[in-house]
Amino acid sequence: MILKSFLLGNLVSLCMKIINSVVVVGLYYGFLTTFSIGPSYLFLLRAHVMEEGEEGAEKKVSATTGFITGQLIMFISIYYAPLHLALGRPHTITVLALPYLLFHFFCNSKKNFLDYGSTTRNSMRNLSIQCVFLNNLIFQLLNHFILPSSMLARLVNIFMFRCNSKMLFVTSSFVGWIIGHILFMKWVGLLLVWIRQNRSIRKYIQANKYLVLELKNSMSMAGIFSIFLLVTCVHYLGRIPSPIFSTKLNMLEKMEEEEEFDNNEEEEFDNNEEEEFDNNKTVDYMYGNQENLKFKILEKKQKDEEKNFFLFEKPILTFFFDYNRWNRPLRYIRKINKKLKGSVRKEASQYFFYTCQSDGKQRISFTYPPSLSTFGEMIARRISLSTLEKISPDELYTEWVFTNKEKKNNLNNEFINRIEALETVFLSLNILEAKTRLSNAETKNKNNCLVKMYDPFLNGMYRGRMKKLFSSSIINETSIENCTETAELNKIHDILLPYPNSPENEQKIERSEKKKRKIDSNNGLKFSLNEILTNPKREKKYIGINEIGKKPPRWSYKLINELEQYFKKRRKEQGIMQGLDHQLRTRKFKHIAFLTRSERSFKKSHFKNYNLYRKFNRDSGFISYLEEPDFRRAVIKDSMRVQRRKMVIWGPSQGNPHSPLFLEKMEDFPFPISDLMKLFFNIRDWLGKKSEFEILDQQFQIKKNNQEDVIEFWENIPYAQKSRSVLLLAQSIFRRYIKLPLLIIAKNIGRILLRQSPEWYEDFQDWNREIYLKCNYNGLQFSKTEFPKNWLIEGFQIKILYPFHLKPWHRSKLRLSDRDRKQQDDFDSCFLTVLGMETEYPFGPPRKTPSFFEPIFKDIDYKVEIRKFNFRIRRALKKIKKKEAKVFFFVKQILKELLKGKKIPLFITREIYESNETEREKDSIISNKIIHESLSQNRPKGLTNYSQTEEEMKHRIDRRNTIRNQIEIMKKNKKTVTLKKKINKKNNGEALPTIWKILKRNNIELIVKIFIEKIYIDIFLCIINMRRIALQLFMESTKKIIEKYIDNNETNKEKINKTKQNQIDFISTRTIKKAFDNLRNSKRKSNIFFELSYLSQKYVFLKLSQTQVIHFNKLRSILQYNGPSFFLKNEIKDFFGRQGIFDYEVRHKKLPNSGMNPWKNWLRGHYQYDLSQITWSRLVPQKWRNGKNQCQPSQNKDLNKWYSYEKDQLFDYKKKQNLKVYLLSNKEENFQKNYRYDRLSYKYIHSETNKKSYIYRSSLEPNKKQENSTRNKEKTVNILKNIPIKNYLGKSDIIYMEKNTDRKYLGWKLNTNIQVESNKDQIQIRDKIPNNGLFYLPIYSNSEINYKRVFFDWMGMPFDWMGMNEKFLILNRPISNPKFFLFPEFLILYHKYKEKPWFIPSNLLLFNLNINPNFSENQNIKGKHEEDEDFFNFSPSNSKQYFELKNQNNIEESLLESIEKLQILIKGDFPLQLRWTGRLNQLNQKMMNNIQIYGLLVSLINVRKISISYIQRKEMNLDIMRRRLNLTQLTKKGILIMEPARLSVKNDGQFFMYQIIGISLVHKSKHQSNQRYRNPQNVAKNHFDESIPRHKTLNRDKKNSDLLVPEKILSSRRRRELRILISFNLKNQNNVHRKKFFCKENKIKNWSQFLDESENFDRKKNELIKLKFFFWPNYRLEDLACMNRYWFDTNNGSRFSMLRIYMYP
């Protein structure tokens, strides 16, 4: 067995070595490249198939040789770099392909082009064989058509970098390719043999002999191949950008002219005189010195000469094919803030990796400047390697360590000396290291210091932020942040250091150049001195000075698109701005104007200046985009475009095209089966019935598609709009003045000839009623007389109001019916087509016009129908007369019989009639026998028939009389009749049919009676049930009223004794009873037992708390578990301990060092870096929140179930407003339940890091104030730390995302004046306790809730939005499903939150923030259980009023103010969007109709009359016709929905870099001056970067905690340097073991020990506060980021991947 296993192991290892060897892998990849088929295979197959004979054999050999040679060259180019560059560059392929295609074209076009007469065999002069060789060789190099992605061929290139012996790999891959090629050619040969032997194919070839002859003809094949190759190469050349037809970038001088158009238009128009004066000043200063002017002219000439000379110096190849030349890039990025603009360059990568010296070692930097690296390479080429001295890395590192130690010792000594001075000397600010400022040495005046913005000795926050303004001379005070003193005006630095990039200065200089005003140098010098010697008390108005310096021509230009060019042209026409040529392409658009200001309207106005009139009365219109795919995609005009070679377009218009390699990443895979399913459902819909709405939608879609087809037809024809416009105009004139008058004349002449009265007046009256309106391209009404702007080029429409239709006659008004009058008054309109026909809408199909002869034919048909109807009536009357005669005769006979006294039955049933007939037949048989025997002998011969019938009649009469007598006897004597039935069989047989008739009749009556009784019973049951239901509802309602009254009485009683009761924050008894009632009902319906999943955890612990004695052994396994807590928290066990249920000793204790990674632990203390799980997962490839020693504890899966039931639900005992726990699932409360659950789960996860959180209590303090710890003393400042707002609302931070387990949102509860709290046995309703927290929001106090309803109505939200007032509304109405105004949870924080999503301090997230000065953290509540306010506390206040609502009359004013605030929110730079609801099509149609009518009304004189007619016809919608649309009403009605536009979250390396390095952009509230120091009382215990507003620290009392932070002694720069030097030489002192599985290098040192939040923090808070201020301020991360202290996985030099941001040494 051992031998077998040994042999087997050796065999497996041998096989693995063989498989992994370079030769086998090369053979495999070479074999795969065989399937990369290109055009060269076509030449090879042609030579093998079509060529025959000796010459054919030579051509086969030459084709195979050329093919293999070309492939060999391709394989060699993989290894040999120059050959790879030659064959890989696009210009080389272009140079090779174009001449060869030309040569090949001439070879195939002329037959004797290569024929040199008779040649010997094996002669090299036979150029046709050489041509075959070149074809296969060159087209093997140009293998680019069939598989453009060339994925199989690139596998060889990829694997070559992974092996060491590259030449062996290339050789083996070439051999593998030859093997695959041989097999492929053998397969092709077998395929040809099979085709020749197949009979069906042979029959087809024989039937098409001419086709075979054509294929055999060499010229036709050569022509086919030449065409095919031409198409192939054109397709290939279309993939590369055109290097010839492109445009140069505009020069810098031209681009500077564009910047003047960014100025304010109104200022430019209104301040002409002032600007002219400024221009004089500018010229006076700039051109006072003529030397500057000469210098500029010489510099410009020198630039032009350098450019021209530089063009000829370049090599020809680089001049034509250099992709880094003057050509424009492909894309141009526009930023939202309009400050960061620029185009995208190919060579500008996101990261640039290069080696540099960092920490004394060679490290890879990913942000190395590319220009510096190229400069270093250029220097290295110039300087020989022998002159450079190489220093070993060890020497560099030791030198670096030595210098750092010296620096550290010096700083330590200085720091120690300053601290000793503090201990001996009084506290003085002189001991603190002051900031070094640049000032005049002679005068030590503070005012002579240079402004902080330009002070080179200041950096960071002290220099402030530079804001780029339109005016360079005005320095805004707000741009210099954290400046306590106001700097006086100093204009010297403004002249020496002007504000850069000033469009105002450039504008004034350019104007002065245009006017060419010359002012001598003396005046200029005088003006300069006056500007320097200024009075500080003067107004801050400066003249713009051109900056001294040179602007580099790198991305200094500014590009505009076609839309901007169009508007600038319009402004130029209006005398406002100048037009420019566009450089960016946009979608095709048309400006649709419905109101223009012409000279005619100017004459009617009160303006005297036409330009002024055009400025204040601009044309009104909007931009309409054509509905077609936009493939230009904002591409720069005349740029080199590269087609996407790997892109596959599935449909005619695809929004996000990409390679098929990434189809698996798509959520909706575009598999053809989806199209088949759609086809199946469409067929099913066609076969079935459709509703009216579907039919209308389909008709609308068909109309829209037809309209788009017609528009596309006119757009594609050259000069179509001009010809169409002229034809429309001609058709309107022809219709108006020629066609219709001729028709009227012809009609009236015909009426005269037919001896009828003519209708000249009526016809011409209808003709004059017709109105022709000129409309724009989309059909918007423009004017009756004026044409739209550019109507000949852009096209226009002609709309006809009340179109004239010729009628054969007119009825008089007296004869008009109501229907005719209504039809006459109806408004009708249509559009004129090019053919003179009418259509309902622009570019629509022609409609059917009423025919002239149709009324005549209708009249004739009507008369004919009347005659037919009269004839039918006459025939019917004749038939009725005949029937009436018969009926009269029948009645007459019946009356005669009645007069005789005979009873004649009018109605005889069928059964009785049949029974009588049978009896008659029997009687007739018997009687016939008797009569035949008796009378046959005595009757005479002539009277035989008559006597026989007479005898029969007599016999029947006698028989009837006997039966009637018997019936009467039976009625009298019933008993005798029954005895006779038993005895006499004959009588029994006669009585049975009569009894059956009676029974049958009785059964029918009984069935009918039973059915009627059943109906009556059902009716009575329904009536009884209705009474019972009404009674039940009445009883329930009265019961609720009584319960409510009892609850109110109980709450009034408990207001007195509320301090004596222990409040337990569980669910109320009413909720429990209601839930159990629902459970019992569900149990009755489903007949199942109770399950544990129906009970929530709160209910279980409620029952546990209510029991007096608990068998502790049953709960020991749960309550005494020492491992990680799965679902029970410490405060639950603390509560049971206080209740006396079990001891504290059995509580599970928190294990030491079970915290999280200290790096993450510290980052979580700073809200800027408290990222979500998904964000961290992209940076750190590990699970979130590992346990100790990299052990992931088992996690309760119920925490991650979003829509799971309330099973094992965590609850927050320390919350002030109780969470309702619904035991059964409810759709209306699904969002509320999930939101609370997510909030609690977030706190549960964060409870380890926050010692003052809701769900945390230290395990080392078991018996500390147990009697007063029934509620937690909340630290309101920490709430934003527990539930931080971070990043911004993106796809990775939405609460509805299933993967998101890290909650980010604030749980809001709006406290009203009545607050409901759940207690043990009853509901407690009580007023607010005026115990305001540290932060609270004021609102006007009133007893009614109407003002709050006004607030929510204004916001477009229901009153119980997000459940904030659900406790108030429980007593008034049932909870409805709320419609949310905004998708995220918070609205008030939204505008602040969007400004700087990750750098806003927590306390600034509140607006109108008030600080209660009487608030103290250490409030001791002994016997009185008061309630703290919520963090978001809408509490009554008398100092400030959020809404100034004094009476009902002020409501309107407050609403207007609130609407203005909402408009500011919308108009601001916030990513909000307005979304239409489902009524989009209807509202759009109404809006378009109103716009058409508005455009017509504005251009008319008599507006009132026509507008009233429009309103009467209900064509103008008055609901939409408002001057200012009320946004709140639109949102309240559901027409508009405001929701945030989700910003795209680009979680890449650049995003995290900016987050870390951008901490220097701290909010201005954190900028504190050096003279002030922090108050530890004002800082949250676990949130050290929080700062307090300055007015909070004015009236503070001096306490022991107001100690100076030692680090503040040094300056920020020295302090930073000391921290970094200390961190370099720290030892590994981490208590928690960390497994370095991210890095493979073992020599990387660990970072310094972070502040571990352990029990020492609770004992020595003040010391740790100081230490934390010392070691980890906010600048710590900035220092490490600026020093490029990051770590990369650099084991493999060919791949660079930033696994995570790693801090070391």
UniProtKB/Swiss-Prot annotation:
UniProt family annotation: Belongs to the TIC214 family.
Keyword field contains Chloroplast: yes
Subunit structure: Part of the Tic complex.
Record PANTHER family: PROTEIN TIC 214 (PTHR33163:SF40), PROTEIN TIC 214-RELATED (PTHR33163)
InterPro entries documented for this protein: TIC214 (IPR008896)
TM region positions: 18-38, 67-87, 127-147, 175-195, 218-238
Main location, first listed in the record: plastid
Protein name (Swiss-Prot/TrEMBL): Protein TIC 214
Keywords for this protein: Chloroplast, Membrane, Plastid, Plastid inner membrane, Protein transport, Transmembrane, Transmembrane helix, Transport
Organism: Helianthus annuus (Common sunflower)
UniProt keyword annotation of Chaperone present: no
Origin: domain of life: Eukaryota
